[in-house]
Amino acid sequence: ATNAFVPDYLRSTGQSEWIGAALSGLNVGQLPASFLLLAFADHLERKTWPYIVCGLLCVIATVGIVFGAGVWVLAATTLQGFAASAILILVLALPPLLSRPDDVHRVTAAMFTISYSCAVIVPVISGLAWDLTGVAKTAFLPIALCGILLVILAPAINHIPRTGS
């Protein structure tokens, strides 16, 4: 959702010159997240704190986008790209960690259904918030709320213990 609203938001705040850099930051920020999660996968697996940290990073980045200017917007969008990528990777790793081997396909299907539904509805809600209030910053409220929701729900993740290892 962030990449959909950043260009218009920056235009509305008189920061059009930062659009290209901000969108690049969103994409470039994804790369270190992928490499870090790969490098530390064994240390992050079955832990709750990575989800909480990523949720907090999402909220911090969203606040930075909304209240920052210039290079701070670039830093915030890069952080948002990092957090969003890390969240996606962590969530995609959940089905085999949450379910018995014979249920992985069902849990995966459910998670993809829920995650793609959210990926569609959050931008709609964000656009609606902006349209109804006429305040550009409100478009980012649903995005920040997703980060807060992740922080709240992360402790409820109940991993299935490993057997036979």
What do these predicted ranges mean?
Residues A1-S34:
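Extracytoplasmic gate region of multi-pass secondary transporters
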